[in-house]
Every structure is written in C-alpha cells, then in structure tokens.
Swiss-Prot record:
S-S pairs: none
Basic and acidic residues: compositionally biased ranges: 73-94
Organism per entry: Prochlorococcus marinus (strain SARG / CCMP1375 / SS120)
An annotated GO BP: translation
UniProt xrefs under Pfam families: Ribosomal_L31
Annotated keywords: Ribonucleoprotein, Ribosomal protein, RNA-binding, rRNA-binding
Role played: Binds the 23S rRNA.
Quaternary structure (record): Part of the 50S ribosomal subunit.
Region Disordered, residue ranges: 64-94
Gene label: rpmE
PROSITE patterns: RIBOSOMAL_L31
Designated name of the protein: Large ribosomal subunit protein bL31
Family to which the UniProt record says this protein belongs: Belongs to the bacterial ribosomal protein bL31 family. Type A subfamily.
Lineage: Bacteria, Bacillati, Cyanobacteriota, Cyanophyceae, Synechococcales
Domain of life per record: Bacteria
Length: 94
C-alpha cells in the first residue's frame, strides 16, 4: 500500500503544447507540457532540414571552429589591417 500525500498528482489527460497548439494528450504529473519539437515538426519525421537554435549554440559552434559568417570575417580583416598599418609605420621610421 503506497503512503499517502507523498506521491505527485497524476493527470491522465495532460496536454502537450507546441507553438501554442495542443498536439496530443498523455498521462503526466503536470497538467500541461510545453515542447519546442515533437514528431509532427521534427526534421527526421517531416523530411526537411531545419536548424533549431534556442540558445545560440549553433553560432557558438561556428565561432569556435572558425566557420563564422562572412560579415564576421570582415571585422577580423579590419583588425588585421590595423596591425599591418601600425607595423608598416614602425618599419618606415627605421
């Protein structure tokens, strides 16, 4: 016999919500479950390719492994050109 008042409430018709729509019902200890991805919009099941980046992890990966956007490369070139200019001016004084 289970002890009383130690188990969570069971909701046999808990709603699973994705993008504001109820996509399915299931049993859970929470009345509503909010998800970003489910089988109806997951790329594996839909046959499409989509990058879902909720916390900037893709950008962090791209920066870490040198696969930055072309816009970011232009800022790197500006920094390196400033170094070249300062080196050129110091060598001219010699």
């Amino acid at each position: 016999m289970p002890k009383k008042d130690i188990h969570p409430n069971w909701y046999p018709d808990a709603k699973v919500i994705c993008n504001g729509e109820v996509v399915m019902t299931t049993g859970s200890t929470q009345p509503e479950i909010h998800v970003d991805v489910w089988s109806g919009n997951h790329p594996f099941f839909t046959g499409t390719q989509k990058i879902l980046d909720t916390e900037g992890r893709v950008d962090r990966f791209m920066r870490k492994y040198g696969m930055a956007n072309p816009d970011e490369d232009s800022t790197k070139n500006t920094k390196s050109s400033k170094k070249e200019t300062s080196e050129d001016s110091s060598s001219k004084g010699s």
